[in-house]
Amino acid sequence: MFMINILMLIIPILLAVAFLTLVERKVLGYMQLRKGPNVVGPYGLLQPIADAIKLFIKEPLRPATSSASMFILAPIMALGLALTMWIPLPMPYPLINMNLGVLFMLAMSSLAVYSILWSGWASNSKYALIGALRAVAQTISYEVTLAIILLSVLLMSGSFTLSTLIITQEQMWLILPAWPLAMMWFISTLAETNRAPFDLTEGESELVSGFNVEYAAGPFALFFMAEYANIIMMNIFTAILFLGTSHNPHMPELYTINFTIKSLLLTMSFLWIRASYPRFRYDQLMHLLWKNFLPLTLALCMWHVSLPILTSGIPPQT
């Protein structure tokens, strides 16, 4: 039964990833005043299936100088970790209801750095290594602010269990009292998932394609799927944290519809941002984090810690 549950989680994720690639190409196309993919199937709807078949039947080439085991393990690990991070997400019921779901998410996102590092190192190419080192520095840096923002939000929720956030936000979305945190969280998720304008790891103009430059066919597709699964997962996480949907046990469909719309709008904003903004310079990216976001998030975290202590002495207003 548990295996069926796992499959019921994984298959929709992979389908969502496939069609997100199509949506992205369509959105970017229309924003650049062109059509986007429209040949394979009606309105180009079968394009992702054609892409998947093409990628998986190609011969997976490997550079002669690469480290074989690491080179093959890195994309498998990337997709595995990307799918593992979905386990504690309440939609409205998680696959496994963990007591420390948030810590699990942070641990898994930290591990995702290793797959990028391995792929860059195992490729034995200078471009791949530079891309991987950039990706690792960027991901580790932005994880610091993500963790502090999460801590501040959880102080308002009072639990490390993600399901508690649904109950916390029955009266009011947390984006209203914590909008500076939400803004910094959203920008940090962009950097964490290596999306434009923070896509320095795969800067086509300078690094060819970044850490996955030596990958082709199936292994490349695994990296691609991992990246898009992480984008959807991060947007779902944002919707859970800041745009909590109230759950009525008698009408669970309403929760699903509401929650899906919020997640899709956030994902759409990722695509819109990609179409609108130029890429950051690497030093600007780090400056934004260490000089701007980190002091701000630390100050807000101290505020969120001290606020309950300050207000605990106020008697109830009758």
UniProtKB/Swiss-Prot annotation:
Alphabetical list of InterPro entries matching this protein: NADH_UbQ_OxRdtase_su1/FPO (IPR001694), NADH_UbQ_OxRdtase_su1_CS (IPR018086)
Record key words, sorted: Electron transport, Membrane, Mitochondrion, Mitochondrion inner membrane, NAD, Respiratory chain, Translocase, Transmembrane, Transmembrane helix, Transport, Ubiquinone
Reaction(s) the record says it catalyses: a ubiquinone + NADH + 5 H(+)(in) = a ubiquinol + NAD(+) + 4 H(+)(out)
UniProt topology in membrane: Multi-pass membrane protein
EC numbers: 7.1.1.2
PROSITE patterns reported in the protein's UniProt record: COMPLEX1_ND1_1, COMPLEX1_ND1_2
Family indicated by similarity: Belongs to the complex I subunit 1 family.
Free-text function comment from the UniProt entry: Core subunit of the mitochondrial membrane respiratory chain NADH dehydrogenase (Complex I) which catalyzes electron transfer from NADH through the respiratory chain, using ubiquinone as an electron acceptor. Essential for the catalytic activity and assembly of complex I.
Quaternary structure (record): Core subunit of respiratory chain NADH dehydrogenase (Complex I) which is composed of 45 different subunits.
Name of the protein described by the UniProt record: NADH-ubiquinone oxidoreductase chain 1
